[in-house]
Amino acid sequence: SYTFSFFNRIDYKFKQRYLLGASFVREGSSKFVKENRFGDFYSVSGGWIISDEAFMRNAGFISLLKLRGSYGETGNQNIPSEVTKNSYSIKSKQYYNNMQNMFLWNIANKAAKWEKNKSIDLGLDYALFNNKVNGSIAYYRRTTSDMLMRVQLPASAGITNSGGNADNNSMWANVGSMYNQGFEFDINVTLVKKDFEWNM
């Protein structure tokens, strides 16, 4: 199997405190059929360095205050290369009417496509007292859709446990989704900064 991709990215900074970025990725994988071969994934990010604004000049104890946010998409095609193809195997030392047996090893799923991951991140980075205290507060949200997983095939498919392989009575397919979110907090404190440095 092989993969190929096209990538574009733009970054823009205005007055050294307004930040904007965007990217586009188009990925292709030979693991999928022609109709589903490509996946398009976008991302955008922005930032505002609040501490550089004129109204923050009297807040001398604030070394840095930055608001940031981003949205991004990525794809996953971590599946065997034969998912969209029927494959067969020959049973060794097993014959019927002097002919060696052949059985269906993998049943094709031509509808398989890219799994997509979407993420949203919002955060506030800070540094206080001449960078003696710094850290971040962030919220994240992750969503995975069209998850690539094995699904059990019914006995009527005719390949239940063919050849003694427990995996080939199932098929890779886009089934299910996953969602999680949460908050992250980070703080670093420099307690002493003279002849030696003590971090906590």
Where are the regions a protein language model picked out?
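Extracellular/periplasmic, surface-exposed regions of secreted and cell-surface proteins
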Residues: 1-200
